Every structure is written in structure tokens, then in C-alpha cells.
């Protein structure tokens, strides 16, 4: 299988190629089209993605027309990043008449964690996280080589946006946490999920995991026509109004005061 994967869900722009059972990838930090003084402007996803795809295909000696499918990180995540990934994947898919595979960003985090039972929490801003929980059973000898083991993936609870104190608590021991939500809301999530066996806040969405999950989904017949693919936003609001911002600050102050009083 030849499968191209791309992910612009969060701050890192990444692409990967699954070619004859071997995964190769490259990534770069991306900004959102703004610069933060005094450092230089960070290139945006839209500036980075196509050159990275061209460079990876050239490095691997694979023409775009050789691809069987294109997978992309569909969300949840940065609304702008999701639209860029979906738009680029659609453009490429339509150009070469290949299907797309939309991969949930939280499932890619759970896969990247390497754990069998993982709760993925991605900082959603506005006092919330995107979260979901998965059971993943990996086994050797998958059809796409050692970089993509055969796997069954059970969604224990579906992706959602919620406050850290409202994250569903999975039943049973052995669960691990992954994602930057565990650093952005460390105290609240530790209180909500005290029984987690471990936490890795460094795990983030990325094209390598998107490629692996995309290959599994493609084999299962879950690819769609490029024109039908769409991001999965989970929520439809990107900013708080002034009253909501004030309420969020007040709530944070109350939590800090309560924490200090214990």
C-alpha cells in the first residue's frame, strides 16, 4: 500500500508516507500566521504543508499518482489547522482521483501513546479539553508491514469538548493519559482521573499515527470520495464573549484560592 498522511491539528505540521510497509515522516513547528515579538515569525501550516509533501515524496521516489489513498487528521483540534489539512487532502485526492481517510486526532494520540487503554486529552482552550478514550489491541503480522501492526480499536467514549472536571472516568485499572491537556489542566485532570497508571503530556497528534490508522481504516473499507471528506470539529464555537471570558477568569481564581486553602 502507498498511503500519504498529513496532520495540522495542533502546533506541529507533519506528513508521513506508508510505502511497502515502511513509514517515513517529517514534521515542522507551525504558527497560526502571526509572530510573537521578539522572535521571528513562525511559518504557518498553509505555508509548510505542500512543500513538505513534495519533499517527502521526492525523497522517497514516489510520485503522487502512485498513492492508493490519502489520510488526514480530521480533528478535533485547531479549526484553521483542520480546514487546511482537509482542504489539501481534498485537492490532492481530487487531482489524482484517490479516496481520503479521515482519522480522528484523539485516536491518533492514543495510538501514538503505545498503550492498550488510553484517554487522550487535547487542550481545546476556553477552559476545555477535547477528550476521548480508546482500547487498542495490537498484534504482529499486519498486512502493511511492521510499522502498521494489525489492530482492533474500541472507542470507549466518543470525542467531545468539555471542562476538565467533566471528562468521563473510564472503568477499570490500567488506563493511561496522553496529550497536552494533561499539562494545560494538570491539577483539574489529576483530581478528575486520580487512578491513571501514567500520563504522557508530550503525546500529540501526528502524521505517523494518522498513516497507521489510515491504513487500517482503508483496509476496512472506510475511505471516502475526496469530495465528501470533512473536518470533525466536535464543537462549533471558537471564542468566548467578554462575559464568558470574565466567568472563566473568575472560576480559575476560585479554583486557585480553593487549592491554596487545602
Annotate each PLM feature:
Residues 1-74, 204, 259-262:
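N-terminal beta-alpha supersecondary unit
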Residues 22, 28-44, 99-205, 219, ...:
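Surface "functional belts" at beta-alpha junctions
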Residues 56-60, 95, 113, 210-218:
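Stable alpha-helical structural segments in soluble proteins, enriched in small hydrophobic residues
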Residues 58-65, 93-103:
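Phosphate-handling active-site elements
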Residues 71-99:
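DPxDG-like acidic metal-binding loop motif
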Residues 223-227:
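Flexible, glycine/charged-enriched surface loops at secondary-structure junctions
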Residues 243, 250-251, 256:
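Amphipathic, membrane-active segments
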